């Protein structure tokens, strides 16, 4: 455990009853509660949002908040405060979420609606330049010729934060499994900063606060480089991070060596969690103190996985970087 922060008591209260959903600790970590919407809640939500196709949510951004309110109302208005409490709690900051009855690629639009409702109870999802929408769907196949590790199946996608090549702060990341065929492996990998045994060493290094250049490959549809330090602090002085090894561009030998050592220290951490995410489930994490990645897949000629992501900002609290807004 890192000396800079201490884990508080787990916020998951197994004795508390919620309306419309259940909440239990996940099998992987007490930092990662698992929230499940009941079958009745799921069915009633889908019935009440059926009049709006996904295209309506794309064109009319206020509808994203409307579907969020519908879901929260179905949960007796207990959902929104629970989501915010968990995501902003440094001891947790993450959820594994699913809805009973949503578990097939034929329900892809319903998955987008559900994830959109949840995300817009805590904030707003940013424009995703890769897709041109507030969310992005992408497919991983057995053979890939893209310009980043996002879709490459036979190697580990290293741990990183999202939103590293854009100017907006990315407070949260939502990652949903839409489809999976002929898949073995490929678990989500997560690392909480306070479980990273080398955090003190790198957070206190002179290069930790030096602005560095981040540049995205062409597939991201972002042409402007951004500059910021890898580490910063939140409002309480605790370490937060904004880093991805693929896109950071060291300007000299000193930065290059330090970044290489940083990457090795992250990837070899004993605090990494391996989390299976079945079709229909999604992870929702605080992007400022959780890093995420993906384990490798076992090769198969018909391998296919489709994912959906949303990433955005919290609208109900300011937990941004303090020295490099």
From Swiss-Prot:
It catalyses: glutarate + 2-oxoglutarate + O2 = (S)-2-hydroxyglutarate + succinate + CO2. Binds 1 Fe(2+) ion per subunit. GO terms for biological process: L-lysine catabolic process. CDD domains: CAS_like. InterPro entries: GlaH (IPR015038), TauD-like_sf (IPR042098). Coiled coil: none annotated. Its EC number is 1.14.11.64. Fe cation binds at residues 160, 162, 292. SUPFAM superfamilies: Clavaminate synthase-like (SSF51197). Pfam families: CsiD. It is an enzyme of class 1 (oxidoreductase). Keywords: Dioxygenase, Iron, Metal-binding, Oxidoreductase. Pathway: Amino-acid degradation. GO terms for molecular function: ferrous iron binding; glutarate dioxygenase activity; oxidoreductase activity, acting on paired donors, with incorporation or reduction of molecular oxygen, with 2-oxoglutarate as one donor, and the other dehydrogenated. Homotetramer. NCBIfam families: PRK02963.1. Belongs to the glutarate hydroxylase family. This is Glutarate 2-hydroxylase. It comes from Escherichia coli O127:H6 (strain E2348/69 / EPEC).
């Amino acid at each position: 455990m890192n000396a800079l922060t201490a884990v508080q008591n787990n916020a998951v209260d197994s004795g508390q009853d919620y309306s419309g959903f259940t909440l239990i600790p996940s099998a992987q970590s007490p930092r990662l509660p698992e929230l499940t919407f009941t079958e009745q809640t799921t069915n009633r939500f889908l019935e009440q949002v059926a009049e709006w196709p996904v295209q309506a949510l794309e064109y009319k951004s206020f509808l994203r908040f409307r579907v969020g309110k519908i879901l929260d109302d179905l949960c007796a208005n207990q959902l929104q405060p629970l989501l915010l409490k968990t995501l902003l709690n440094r001891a947790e900051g993450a959820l594994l979420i699913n809805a009973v009855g949503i578990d097939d690629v034929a329900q892809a639009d319903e998955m987008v609606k559900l994830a959109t409702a949840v995300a817009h109870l805590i904030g707003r999802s940013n424009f995703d330049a890769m897709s041109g929408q507030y969310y992005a769907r992408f497919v991983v196949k057995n053979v890939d010729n893209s310009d980043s590790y996002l879709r490459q199946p036979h190697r580990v996608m290293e741990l990183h934060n999202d939103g590293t090549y854009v100017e907006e702060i990315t407070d949260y990341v939502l990652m949903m499994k839409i489809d999976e065929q002929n898949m073995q492996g490929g678990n989500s990998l997560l690392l909480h900063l306070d479980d990273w045994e080398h955090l003190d060493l790198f957070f206190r290094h002179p290069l930790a606060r030096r602005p560095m250049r981040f540049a995205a490959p062409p597939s991201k549809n972002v042409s402007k480089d951004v500059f910021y330090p890898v580490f910063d602090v939140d409002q309480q002085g605790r370490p937060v991070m904004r880093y991805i090894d693929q896109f950071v561009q060291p300007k000299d030998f000193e930065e290059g060596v330090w970044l290489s050592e940083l990457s090795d220290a992250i990837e070899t951490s004993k605090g990494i969690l391996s989390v299976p995410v079945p079709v229909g489930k999604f992870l929702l994490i605080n992007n400022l103190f959780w890093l995420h990645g993906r384990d490798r897949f076992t090769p198969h000629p018909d391998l296919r996985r489709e994912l959906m992501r949303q990433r955005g900002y919290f609208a109900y609290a300011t937990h941004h970087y303090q020295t490099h807004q």
